A protein has these predicted regions:
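C-terminal accessory module of base-excision DNA glycosylases/AP lyases that mediates lesion recognition
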Residues: 1-31, 35, 92-97, 108-111, ...
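Structure-specific DNA junction-binding interface
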Residues: 1-86
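Alpha-helical ds-nucleic-acid-binding substructure associated with the helix-hairpin-helix region
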Residues: 58-130
Length: 214
């Protein structure tokens, strides 16, 4: 049996041993390109529910017209990315501008365009060419676009793997373990990603019952 097969078996066994691990489907994504870009570029290294989610909600409320990429980019340039995103530190505002510019160059205007574009094999390398976007954010953009065949490996998923006695040597290995475990559990990789993320987030915050994560 390969090392990966052993790791997948260990992960599935760990999940089956958790009485409070409840499979939950991801919620519907944003129908607003500004929200998608903001969500993806702000989420790294901060608490999603208390930091990112309120800022995305505020952006949708204050900039309802930014449902297309070009209008969102116009707002970023006219009002300033720091004001639009509600974020004034670090490179995240610049990353949001660069991502919007890439999508415009790729003729991605609407959420429908984005959902189609993100599935092209050439799209991920282009995303990774933007400063501030790594493998996790590139995959997270895929999840925001509704892809179900991947997982975005963050600190919560890595910690869950360690709890199962697994120490992946790379992002790609961790992702492969999650994807194979999802097959064993007969759920999509995106659903398993979402469920682990919420389970670990709630456990850290002391919440008893996991729910859904956007």
């Amino acid at each position: 049996m390969s090392d990966q097969a052993v790791a997948v078996r260990a992960l599935v066994s760990h999940i089956h041993a958790l009485d409070d691990f409840l499979i939950a489907e991801p919620s519907a994504g944003h129908e607003h390109m500004g929200a998608i870009i903001a969500d993806a570029t702000l989420q790294a290294g901060v608490k999603y529910q208390t930091v990112v989610a309120p800022k995305v909600t505020r952006l949708i409320r204050n900039y309802p017209q930014c449902v297309t990429t070009s209008v969102f980019l116009d707002c970023l340039k006219s009002d300033g990315p720091e004001r639009v995103l509600g974020w004034s530190r670090g490179r995240k505002p610049e990353t949001a501008v660069a991502l919007a510019e890439l999508l415009i160059a790729e003729d991605v205007e609407t959420v429908g365009d984005f959902k189609a574009w993100v599935r092209f094999p050439t799209s991920r390398p282009k995303l990774l060419g933007i400063s501030g976007i790594g493998p996790k954010t590139a995959d997270y953009l895929g999840l925001l676009a509704g892809r179900t065949d991947l997982a975005a490996i963050d600190v919560h998923l890595n910690r869950f793997l360690r709890d199962a006695g697994i120490s992946p040597v790379s992002y790609e290995q961790a992702q492969s373990i999650i994807i194979e475990a999802a097959k064993r559990l007969r759920v999509s990789p995106a659903t398993l990603d979402h469920t682990i993320w919420k389970y670990m987030s709630n456990r850290k915050e002391g919440t008893a019952t996991p729910s859904c994560h956007s």
